[in-house]
C-alpha cells in the first residue's frame, strides 16, 4: 500500500518523516543523515547531485551548484545551466524527489502522498510554487501547512491534558515566523488552533552567515589589500566557513577561521586567518536579531493575550540554536525557558507526518485549524477597502457580502481584490481584477451582486461574484497576486498602525460623500415624481438645497459637503409635510376611492423617501 509522508522543505536543509504504527519517525537519507542539505548540483558530465554530495563539491563547481532555492519560490527567478533554464519549482522538485526516494528505500514501499510545510507568511504564489514542486517530483500534495503549526502539532499532542497556549518561534535558514497556537484537549482528542501569526519571509540564518562573510571580506582586504567580493570561488569558501563559524559560536565564545590560499597576490598566495568572538558576531548581527522582536509583539497583541498566558515556548529551525536568539526569546517571554525537548531541525517534518496521518485516516485524534496572515477585501465606492476576511481568520473559510451598482443602468461591475490592513485600497496590495458583465438594466441600488471570498486549507484564495438577478457569475483564483515581499507586509501593518487616526477621518469623509450622493439622488427623484403635489415655494427651496449639495460634491471641500448635506437633510422634511398636507386636503374634499388609492400610493413613496437617510441603507446602496 502506498504511503504518505511529511516533508519539511527547508532553505538550508530538508527532512522527511513518516508515521509507523501511528507514531512519527524521521527517515535517514541514503548517506545516513536525518537532514538533507537543500542543494542541487549539475556536474559537467551531465549528472545531477542532490543533498550532501551536491554540497561537498560546491566550491569546485560553484557556477553549477544551487542552494537556498526556497528564497526564490513564487518568483520568476531562473538559473541557467548549459542550455537550459531551471525554475525554483524544478530545483525544489529535485530535492523532494531525493526525499521521496530515500523514504521509499527505507519503507520498502512506494510513496505517493505528502504534506509539505511552508513558512506561515508564505504568500499564494509561494504556496502554489511549493505545490507544483511536489507535483513535479511525483507527489500528490495532500496539504500545504505552516511550519509553526506543524511544530505545535508535533510538540503539543504529548503535553498533558489541559488547554494551553504554545508559542512557536521559528527561525530557519531563510525565513522567520512566530505563531501563537491554542491546544485544546479532551480525553481522546486534541484541537490545535492558530490564534495569530506574523513573520518575515526574508530573514533567516543565511543573513547571519552573510554578515560573517562581509566581515571576513573586509578584514581580508585590510590585511592583504585583495578584494575577494567578486571572486565566486573565494566567496563560496567564505560562506561555508561562515556557516561553520556560526555553529561553533553557539557552543564556544570564539572560533578560528583559517582559509589557506583564499586568493593570489603579486607576492604569492594570500591566506585568511581570523578569530571571531561571539561578542563580535552578535554585534555584527544585532539588527537582524531585533527584526524578530516586532513580529513577536504583534502576535501577542493580536491574539489578545499577555506573555504570562503562554504555557510553552518552542524553538524551531537550526538558527534558534544561537545563544543570542535564545536569550532574546527568554527576555520577550518574561524569562520563560524555551523547551529543549524537541529537535529544532526535525520537529516540523514530524508535525507534517502527523498531519499526513490525519488526512489519510491513520490518526483520528487531532484537528488542525490554521489562519490567513493578511486581510482580504474589495474596493467599494470612494476607494474604501471593504474587508471580507480579516487577518488571522481560521482557514478554510468562506465569506460573502452583497453589494450593488453606483450608477443607473450599469451593465457591469469591476471586482478589484486587495490584500492589506489599511482603510483605503490605494494603500493596500492589488491582487487582481475581474469583471462581472451582463447585469440587467436597472436604477442604481437595485441590482444585487454577491461577492464571495473562499480561502482553502492550503491558504490559496478564490474569489467569485454573482448577479442575483440574472444568475451571471464570474470567478478567479489568486495564484500570484499576493506575492508580497516582507517590506510590503511590514509596511502595510506598520502604516496601518501609524495612520489609524488619519484613515478613520478619511473613511468618515468618504462615508459622508457616499451618503450625500445618495440623498441628493433620492430627493431629486422624489421631487420629480411628486411635482404636481408640491407647493412651488417648498419645491424651489428643497431643489435649491439639492443643487447646492451637488455643487459641493463636485468640489474637494469636505466641510462644504457636510454643511450642504446637513442642510438638505433638514429641509427634506418639508417635502413630506407638503405631500401629507396635500393628501389630507384631497380626503377632506371627499375624493373617490381611486383618489384614496392614489394617496396610499403617495404614502408608500414617502416611506421610500424617508429610509434613504438611514446610514446602513446608504452604505449598502453605495457599494
From Swiss-Prot:
Q: Per its record, what triggers expression of this gene product?
A: By stress conditions e.g. heat shock.
What one GO molecular function would you report for this record?
unfolded protein binding
The UniProt entry, under InterPro entries, shows: ATPase_NBD, Chaperone_DnaK, Heat_shock_70_CS, HSP70_C_sf, HSP70_peptide-bd_sf, Hsp_70_fam
Q: Where is the composition biased (Low complexity)?
A: 581-596
User: Which portions of the sequence form the region Disordered?
Assistant: 581-623
The answer to keyword tRNA processing applying to this record is no
Q: Which residues carry this modification: Phosphothreonine?
A: 175
**Could you list the residue ranges forming a coiled coil in this record?**
none
Here the segments flagged for biased composition (Acidic residues) are 604-617
Disulfide pairs? Answer: none
Which keywords describe this protein according to UniProt? ATP-binding, Chaperone, Nucleotide-binding, Phosphoprotein, Stress response
| Task performed by this protein | Acts as a chaperone.
Recorded hits in PANTHER family, A to Z, give:
HEAT SHOCK PROTEIN 70KDA
Q: Which family does it belong to?
A: Belongs to the heat shock protein 70 family.
Q: What is this protein called?
A: Chaperone protein DnaK
Amino acid at each position: 500500500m502506498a504511503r504518505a509522508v511529511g516533508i519539511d522543505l527547508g532553505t538550508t536543509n530538508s527532512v522527511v518523516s513518516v508515521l509507523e504504527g501511528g507514531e512519527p519517525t524521521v527517515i535517514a537519507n541514503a548517506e545516513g543523515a536525518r537532514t538533507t542539505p537543500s542543494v542541487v548540483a549539475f556536474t559537467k558530465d551531465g549528472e545531477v547531485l542532490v543533498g550532501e554530495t551536491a554540497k561537498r563539491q560546491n566550491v569546485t563547481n560553484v557556477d553549477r551548484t544551487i542552494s537556498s532555492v526556497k528564497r526564490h519560490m513564487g518568483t520568476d527567478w531562473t538559473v541557467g545551466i548549459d542550455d537550459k533554464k531551471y525554475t525554483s519549482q524544478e530545483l525544489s522538485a529535485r530535492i523532494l524527489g531525493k526525499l521521496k526516494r530515500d523514504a521509499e528505500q527505507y519503507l520498502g514501499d512506494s510513496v505517493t502522498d505528502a504534506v509539505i510545510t511552508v513558512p506561515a507568511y508564505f504568500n499564494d504564489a509561494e504556496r502554489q510554487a511549493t505545490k507544483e514542486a511536489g507535483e513535479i517530483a511525483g507527489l500528490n500534495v495532500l496539504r500545504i501547512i505552516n511550519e509553526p503549526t506543524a511544530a505545535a502539532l508535533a510538540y503539543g499532542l504529548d503535553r498533558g491534558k489541559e488547554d494551553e497556549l504554545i508559542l512557536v518561534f521559528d527561525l530557519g535558514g531563510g525565513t522567520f515566523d512566530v505563531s501563537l497556537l491554542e491546544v485544546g484537549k479532551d480525553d481522546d482528542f486534541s484541537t490545535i488552533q492558530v490564534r495569530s501569526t506574523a513573520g518575515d519571509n526574508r530573514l533567516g540564518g543565511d543573513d547571519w552567515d552573510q554578515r560573517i562573510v562581509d566581515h571576513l571580506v573586509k578584514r581580508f582586504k585590510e590585511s592583504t589589500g585583495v578584494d575577494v567580493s567578486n571572486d565566486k570561488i573565494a566567496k563560496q569558501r567564505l560562506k561555508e566557513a561562515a556557516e561553520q563559524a556560526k555553529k561553533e559560536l553557539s557552543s564556544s565564545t570564539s572560533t578560528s577561521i583559517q582559509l589557506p590560499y583564499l586568493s593570489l597576490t603579486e607576492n604569492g598566495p594570500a591566506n585568511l586567518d581570523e578569530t571571531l568572538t561571539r561578542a563580535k558576531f552578535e554585534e555584527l548581527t544585532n539588527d537582524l536579531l531585533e527584526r524578530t522582536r516586532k513580529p513577536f509583539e504583534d502576535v501577542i497583541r493580536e491574539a489578545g493575550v499577555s506573555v504570562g498566558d503562554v504555557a510553552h515556548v518552542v524553538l524551531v529551525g537550526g538558527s534558534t540554536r544561537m545563544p543570542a536568539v535564545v536569550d532574546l526569546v527568554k527576555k520577550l517571554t518574561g524569562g520563560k525557558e524555551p523547551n529543549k525537548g524537541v529537535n529544532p531541525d526535525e520537529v516540523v517534518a514530524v508535525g507534517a507526518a502527523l498531519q499526513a496521518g490525519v488526512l489519510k485516516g491513520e490518526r483520528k485524534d487531532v484537528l488542525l485549524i490554521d489562519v490567513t496572515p493578511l486581510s482580504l477585501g474589495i474596493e467599494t465606492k470612494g476607494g474604501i477597502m471593504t474587508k471580507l476576511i480579516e487577518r488571522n481568520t481560521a482557514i478554510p473559510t468562506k465569506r460573502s457580502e452583497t453589494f450593488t451598482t453606483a450608477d443607473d443602468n450599469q451593465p457591469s461591475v469591476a471586482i478589484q481584490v486587495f490584500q492589506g490592513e489599511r482603510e483605503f485600497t490605494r494603500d493596500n496590495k492589488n491582487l487582481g481584477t475581474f469583471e462581472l458583465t451582463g447585469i440587467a438594466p436597472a436604477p442604481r441600488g437595485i441590482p444585487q451582486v454577491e461577492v464571495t471570498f473562499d480561502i482553502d486549507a492550503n491558504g490559496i484564495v478564490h474569489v467569485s461574484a454573482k448577479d442575483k438577478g440574472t444568475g451571471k457569475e464570474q470567478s478567479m483564483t489568486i495564484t500570484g497576486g499576493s506575492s508580497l515581499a516582507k517590506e510590503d507586509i511590514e509596511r502595510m501593518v506598520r502604516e496601518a498602525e501609524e495612520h489609524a487616526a488619519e484613515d478613520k477621518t478619511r473613511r468618515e469623509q468618504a462615508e459622508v460623500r457616499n451618503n450625500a450622493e445618495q440623498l441628493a439622488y433620492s430627493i431629486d427623484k422624489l421631487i420629480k415624481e411628486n411635482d404636481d403635489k408640491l407647493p412651488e415655494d417648498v419645491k424651489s427651496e428643497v431643489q435649491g438645497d439639492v443643487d447646492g449639495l451637488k455643487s459641493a460634491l463636485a468640489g474637494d471641500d469636505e466641510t462644504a459637503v457636510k454643511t450642504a448635506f446637513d442642510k438638505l437633510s433638514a429641509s427634506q422634511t418639508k417635502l413630506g409635510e407638503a405631500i401629507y398636507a396635500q393628501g389630507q386636503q384631497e380626503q377632506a374634499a371627499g375624493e373617490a376611492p381611486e383618489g384614496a388609492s392614489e394617496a396610499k400610493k403617495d404614502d408608500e413613496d414617502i416611506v421610500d423617501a424617508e429610509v434613504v437617510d438611514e446610514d446602513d441603507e446608504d452604505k449598502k446602496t453605495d457599494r
